[in-house]
Amino acid sequence: MAPISLSWLLRLATFCHLTVLLAGQHHGVTKCNITCSKMTSKIPVALLIHYQQNQASCGKRAIILETRQHRLFCADPKEQWVKDAMQHLDRQAAALTRNGGTFEKQIGEVKPRTTPAAGGMDESVVLEPEATGESSSLEPTPSSQEAQRALGTSPELPTGVTGSSGTRLPPTPKAQDGGPVGTELFRVPPVSTAATWQSSAPHQPGPSLWAEAKTSEAPSTQDPSTQASTASSPAPEENAPSEGQRVWGQGQSPRPENSLEREEMGPVPAHTDAFQDWGPGSMAHVSVVPVSSEGTPSREPVASGSWTPKAEEPIHATMDPQRLGVLITPVPDAQAATRRQAVGLLAFLGLLFCLGVAMFTYQSLQGCPRKMAGEMAEGLRYIPRSCGSNSYVLVPV
């Protein structure tokens, strides 16, 4: 019984070693990084930023939730609050992927803006010439009267005749209703008339709005009798423009107040040829283009048939840095897994070699020499039970 038990022990040891090697290789290939022993309770959706499902090799299915502090919790995928949280996170990820970020439009408060003289946006009103040839006096037309009523100024047009210098005066800041506004005077050769009207601030409901105009005089080589000065008068309360309206002149490109880029306007790109034949005996009127209350200019044709350019509002992109956290799971190294498999295979082969050597040695030790095979006595052979044993077995010959 002793030799049989020893061989079975060797076989059992070989089987156990082989089982351990195979189990180690199996665990080396699996990718179960998080083992969920218990499920968490309900977590507010506002604290979650990411979720993922655990690996199939983990056995028990669970949802791994990540909070803003990058803490991981196991949740049961069958619960309703877990399903709602997964849908909420999926919608957030879809919106972030579609837009590439959260785009927000900057809308400033309704208050007068201060336009610096050097960096602000220049606003000017360009008068369109209309040659009459009959009278050299400046008479208000119906469109100019409507502009006067909208601006709250006197019937006299605040115009100034400039010389043919072809230069451009710097904008003059004026204070009105809480802040200065930049105005600009253009000179167009040979002789042009430019108005220095104030761009009115956003109208607010309440008491009547007073408009203030300042006389602008430019150097001129013409007769002083052709120069007209501006005058200011209080606007009647019933003629005050409604809330959100603004009067723009022809050739002016209205820009939203929240624009961060400074764009300078060129000297009248559309009606340059109309000023060539405009003499001192001509008459000018103002083209009025209504603007909607939301701040975007309406594309309506002006008196000369041209279209006002459409302003483009800047879009500022902001991204939430907390939403950009990506849970990176460690990927097992392929070379390390191959190395572990090679080491396990070599160990298994070595164990088999050692087992073979041990069994050969055991069998060699169990064999007895021929001289101890027994002696013949009266037709019987004495065979010892084992090598070195004093007990014999009688075997008939």
Swiss-Prot record:
Outcome when changing R71A: Loss of binding to CX3CR1 and ability to induce chemotaxis but no effect on binding to integrins
Keywords noted in UniProt: Cell adhesion, Cell membrane, Chemotaxis, Cytokine, Disulfide bond, Glycoprotein, Host-virus interaction, Inflammatory response, Membrane, Secreted, Signal, Transmembrane, Transmembrane helix
CDD domains cross-referenced by the UniProt entry: Chemokine_CX3C
Compartment annotation: Cell membrane
GO annotation terms (biological process): angiogenesis involved in wound healing; antimicrobial humoral immune response mediated by antimicrobial peptide; autocrine signaling; cell adhesion; cell chemotaxis; cell-cell adhesion; cell-cell signaling; chemokine-mediated signaling pathway
Induction details: By TNF and IL1/interleukin-1 in pulmonary endothelial cells and umbilical vein endothelial cells.
Segments on the Extracellular side according to the record's topology features: 25-341
Role this protein plays: Chemokine that acts as a ligand for both CX3CR1 and integrins ITGAV:ITGB3 and ITGA4:ITGB1. The CX3CR1-CX3CL1 signaling exerts distinct functions in different tissue compartments, such as immune response, inflammation, cell adhesion and chemotaxis. Regulates leukocyte adhesion and migration processes at the endothelium. Can activate integrins in both a CX3CR1-dependent and CX3CR1-independent manner. In the presence of CX3CR1, activates integrins by binding to the classical ligand-binding site (site 1) in integrins. (Microbial infection) Mediates the cytoadherence of erythrocytes infected with parasite P.falciparum (strain 3D7) with endothelial cells by interacting with P.falciparum CBP1 and CBP2 expressed at the surface of erythrocytes. The adhesion prevents the elimination of infected erythrocytes by the spleen.
Subunit structure: Monomer. Forms a ternary complex with CX3CR1 and ITGAV:ITGB3 or ITGA4:ITGB1.
Protein's recorded name: Fractalkine
High-level lineage: Eukaryota, Metazoa, Chordata, Craniata, Vertebrata
Gene that produces this protein: CX3CL1
